[in-house]
Amino acid sequence: TCLGVYILALKDGILKQFDQLKSRFERLSFVDAFWHLMVIDAITTREIAECPKNIGLTSFKFNMGYKGPHADLIGITATDDGATYKGFRMISALGPPSIAACHTENIDIHLMLRDELIAQGRKDYKVWNESRPPFVEAECMRRAIYLAKNANCPLYIPHITIAEGVDILAEAHRDGINVVGETCPQYLTHNGEDPAPILVEHPACACVNPPLRDRSSNERLWEGIRRSLIQCIGSDLAPATLAMKGDSIWEAPMGLGNISELLLPVMLSEGVNKGRISLEKVVEVCAYNPARVFGIFPRKGNIEVGADADIVVVDLAKTMTVSPRTLHSMCDWSIYDGWKFTGWPVYTILRGEVIVENGEPRPRAPGQGSYIPRNTLT
């Protein structure tokens, strides 16, 4: 019912383009959304101070894990530590609900390992994790948290993949640091030890940042959710068809497709029905916590008079087998192809209106979605 969307505002920043972007979004969208600004240059850094009061945007992403070929592919640059710390201080000065988000991977070590592995002729699916090993993520997580601590800046770390990440979050919470951890369905269910067939057949599909890890990381991340160390679940959706992925893992666009639509079935089937977490925990990490973290509560993530009446009705006994042919995405493959999930949404309700029933969108004209400003404007 409501998406958190990262905005890559190239050239002129977001403020000059905001009215145009908002108009286009609200003309085409079927659901609501709030936006995060990707801080990629001097312009977007300056805009941090203006976004909350001018456009109701209070979350800002720093790309510590991107430079080189993949950054060039999507038109972004890495944020060095000085620029990151400067941005953190600016966000701290804004006050709640403003928050920084960081993609945490040590990109310099990745690029060094990448060159070594390419020289060896490696192009199998396992090579992606080897080029971005767990310590690369752990080191950058610790660095981002340390910078945020010294700037007194709230920090959101998306798509955590590593077992050590749970320990890092526990240490930060013990030290009283305001850091929120997020993981994604794919990192709870998939790994390089039991690879999805599509990754073996088409290694370029394994190009996702951070990479899929190992079985022990899968279970430690579930533990992190149970212990409220990981407080949010995201999709990190980045769809690409097999043709777009191509034949080279080193040149493929990043991301795994068909994740958003399966986020809730994963949490219900692999989480609730297998006894890993409670249904209440699913509500907490998928709705209540994200709404509070990003300043859209109590309008979203909440059921009470005055809230938006965004509701999902689920059937914990409903069993279906996943196929890319029945999913609603441009992506023609899925790491979940053939998985049988028990626990599916049966009604999705946006602002009191049923918009999806038994997995099929109801006929509606586009333009039903709204941009959701944060509470700073109210």
What are the residue ranges of the model-derived segments?
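Short, electropositive alpha-helical surface patch
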Residues: K16-E26, L113-E130, P154, T161-G181, ...
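Metal-associated gating/positioning segment near the N- to mid-region
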Residues: T1-L28
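A glycine-rich helix N-cap at a beta->alpha junction
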Residues: R24-V39
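Short catalytic-loop micro-motif centered on adjacent basic/acidic residues
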Residues: C2-V5, F34-L37, P154-H159
